[in-house]
Regions:
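Local sequence-structure signature of Cys/Sec-based thiol-disulfide redox active-site neighborhoods
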Residues: 1-28
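Thioredoxin-like thiol-disulfide oxidoreductase module
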Residues: 32-57, 67, 85-90
Length: 92
């Protein structure tokens, strides 16, 4: 099962735009989950993920396979159509 990880900060302007676009995109693929994880949850899990996936800026979307291997990455804002392309694997 493919997942999309979204790394963001609640005070990041571009992150808020991306969040709205994600909601508007209504990606309807059952094999793609949107996983949200604020970059500072205080539990250590987020720190591991930020380091593991080498997150250097937000917002960052990473599509991973079931083993956690990165398939695709995008840093910055995507519009609704671009998000659908990213989810379908046509946006590199």
């Amino acid at each position: 099962m493919v997942k999309i990880l979204k790394f963001y900060s609640p005070i990041c302007g571009p992150c808020k735009v991306l969040e709205k676009n994600l909601k508007d995109s209504k990606i309807e693929y059952v094999d793609i989950n949107i996983f949200e994880d604020a970059c500072h949850d205080g539990l250590g899990t987020t720190d591991y993920l930020v380091e593991h996936y080498n997150i250097r800026a937000v917002p960052t979307l990473i599509k991973i396979d079931e083993s956690g291997e990165e398939l695709n990455r995008h840093v910055g804002i995507l519009n609704v159509e671009q998000l659908k392309e990213f989810a379908n694997g046509t946006n590199d």
